[in-house]
Amino acid sequence: DYTSLLRKFCDDFERTGKIDYEGMRPYPSMLFGLETALFSVQASASGRNPHHLFENAFYEGRRPILTNGLVWMGNYDEMSKRIDEKLDNGFRCIKLKIGSIDFDSELSLLKKIRNRYGPSILEIRVDANGAFGYDEALVKLNRLSSFHLHSIEQPIPTGQWEKMGDLCKKSPVPIALDEELIGINNISIKSSLLDTIHPHYLVLKPSLHGGM
């Protein structure tokens, strides 16, 4: 089980002083956790704050990392309120989840939102979580393009590399891979995936993709 396997990897590290990258590659959350702990120990040993894993402007508090604020799909009033809250909190980029309600209704909401918040005020990204079928995806992407979107995450379900690659070539909205990357831990398979799909962006999650 997970706990026993994690214990084994920690015991191996304690015995050898080295991380078993090949053995841990199929378990990205464990690898991320162990690497983070190691960086923390190394920072402490060098006299730095153990929470400051690297020496750079971000950890020194001189430069932020820009992120997007997540806004779930709802009615227009709810979404406007959430967007206003994000803007008040300093966000200038939001990500909207789409694909959970009628597509025309989502387009209507996006139109109202974009009319209120122009591209110079708010950057909008959308995440379909694989909700589109391949045969309908390009039509939907063309309709979404009128809202000056930064990108769309995972328009179709995972495991369709050739079809996703075709969409990346033709889509007027840049495509980001998210779920497509999860579980792809072998380096040669990762390379093959990227060479086949040629995505515009990657959504990297250390605890899901393995390590720092």
Regions found by a protein language model. Give the residues of each.
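Glycine-rich, proline-tolerant flexible connector loops at the mouths of alpha/beta enzymes
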Residues: E22-Y27, K95-L109
